[in-house]
Amino acid sequence: DLDRLKQHFLSSTKPFQLIPISDMFNNVVCIQISDQNPSSKIRSQVFLFDDGAVIFWNVEDKYQEMIFNQLKQFSDNLYPKTLVESEKEIMNFIEISASSTLNNDLIKINCQSETELLLDKYTFSNALALSVKLGRKRKKERNMKALE
């Protein structure tokens, strides 16, 4: 329930802060983690999609676990932990002062404006979530064909 999740993070205290992306995107919640490594200039954010996909950007393991534990309160039909672990993809990214791109499995995110940075991270997050979803669907189809 994405609406209840939004309300939870709106009333949440540190380290999690709900970040509005745009009124156009109602299928996602963005959370910024504020008390990670203070020397890091790269922000730590999480995109939570209404289909269950979760995309972490520069988030320490302990905070990932905290997010997953909070998600359990607001989710129906949770995916098994083994499935979540098997579908995990780790990609590298850097923040740059040019247009965002994907080159050789390295995501380059434009950090010249906070708004553009957030929208570009949303775009890449959505693409990654769809890629994982497509991969799961194809795997399921292969398994069905193998049973025939």
Report the location of each language-model feature:
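Short Lys/Arg-enriched alpha/beta "domain-start" segment
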Residues: 1-135
